[in-house]
Design a protein with these regions (language model features):
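Extended, low-hydrophobicity, polar/charged segments
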Residues: 1-226, 233, 237-242
């Protein structure tokens, strides 16, 4: 990305990575997108989280959940994306969705809200490695050219929160890459935490009589799918070859 004379770019109605790249001759890898999350802790705290990631990558919410969970003594119950359609938008002051930058001011959080009053700023390594990049200016219809991350005064948590994808190297010590293939889901685990029990007020009392929200999980095995998958991988022209296992 070449140095730009104009720091602000006029990008009317260019709210998506596709739009800004198409209209400004940019590649998604040169753009940093910013997403707002809200984390709810077991102690009722509500954490506004600002995640910056390279435009050609997507966020792995399990990684993000685990990252935030490790930084607080109280357990993280849920993590949700906040956009202009969210009910939680009432806790923000005129946030320009589609034009968010990593330096979004803390004063965008409504002082009357029950949220923490400072952003937890997370930047994925894919974005932090960029020496120059384009991102939102925090003003409607404008994006901004950033010279470096070091020019920003805010504190950032640098972490791996991106979703792995085909073509990624397995490690720095090998040229082997990930291959993506379609499969059949024969079982699943959903770690629901306290997301639903909090809303349903599904509680338990401990030995001391203290109330707590139930920790929930969903564990399933698709019996019919399991048979289907076994047949798909174990057959010949004469029919099914059931595996011994």
């Amino acid at each position: 990305l070449k140095e730009m004379d104009e720091i602000l770019l006029n990008t009317p109605n260019q709210k998506s990575i596709i739009d800004i790249c198409k209209n400004n001759n940019l590649d998604p890898s040169q753009v940093v997108k910013v997403i707002i999350y809200l984390g709810r802790l077991e102690d009722k705290s509500k954490l506004p989280i600002l995640v910056s990631i390279r435009g050609d990558q997507s966020i792995n919410e399990v990684k993000l959940f685990n990252l935030i969970n490790k930084k607080y003594k109280s357990n993280l119950i849920s993590l949700e994306v906040i956009d202009k359609e969210s009910d939680a938008i009432k806790n923000l002051n005129q946030v320009p969705f589609g034009f968010l930058g990593p330096d979004l001011e803390d004063n965008k959080i409504n002082l009357d809200s029950k949220w923490e009053k400072r952003w937890i700023r997370v930047v994925d390594f894919s974005a932090y490695e960029l020496s120059k990049f384009i991102s939102g200016s925090n003003n409607l219809n404008f994006h901004k050219f950033f010279n470096s991350w070091s020019s920003l005064t805010q504190q950032f948590i640098k972490a791996d929160v991106r979703r792995a994808k085909e073509g990624d190297y397995l490690s720095l010590e090998t040229n082997e890459t990930l291959i993506e293939k379609r499969g059949i889901e024969i079982g699943h685990i959903f770690q629901l935490g306290q997301k639903y029990s909090e809303k349903l007020r599904a509680r338990f009392s401990d030995k001391k009589g203290n109330l707590g929200n139930i920790w929930m999980g969903c564990y399933g095995i698709g019996v019919t799918r399991l048979a289907q998958a076994a047949i798909e991988q174990n057959h010949d022209e004469n029919g099914i070859i059931w595996p011994i296992e």
